Amino acid sequence: MASLCTAAIDNGGTDADLVRRARAAATVAELLSVHNEARRAVGVEPLTWSAGIAGYAKKYVESRRGECVPRRSSLFYFGENLFVGKGRHWNATALAAAWVDEGRWYDYGSNTCVGEAPAGCARYTQVVWRNTTQLGCGRIVCDSGDTLLVCDYFPAGNYGTGRPY
């Protein structure tokens, strides 16, 4: 099941369609909340949701259904964060919170990851990148039963040697 590409079109539909759209809207709100709380903590403007960017992310996660590995897409004009969680119990908040948690390893003074950051902190710096204004994500339960989340950011961050904020 892929989700998160929401649009503000109500063409009626079945009760199941309405429930699915309501869940997708709640997931979008959760993802924006996790991202924007981290951005607020460092004085950066909030992100807005882009259904267009979410469409790209959804298409990409659909293509990964059979091979659930965090491999970057070819859309290099977007910044991109990926996460694979074991099992299907992962919700969008927990997945995105893992990226935000990397902030504990980021040292603004040296603009580097410090300590024993097992996965680095580039996903965190993308979340809080000052010039990034739009977010779109796609999530899927892969054939393996694991959960893959991809979030794309525009404009992309993590370029050059600049600081994120």
Stretches found by the model and what they are:
Residues M1-D17:
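N-terminal signal peptide
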Residues A16-G79:
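Short, well-ordered surface patches within globular domains
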Residues L32, A38, E67-R71, N81, ...:
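Mature, structured extracellular domains of secreted fungal proteins
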Residues L47, L82, V127:
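Short clusters of hydrophobic/aromatic residues that line enzyme substrate/ligand-binding pockets
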Residues P70-A96:
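A solvent-exposed, acidic/Ser-Thr-rich amphipathic alpha-helical stretch
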Residues K86-Y165:
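Disulfide-stabilized extracellular recognition modules
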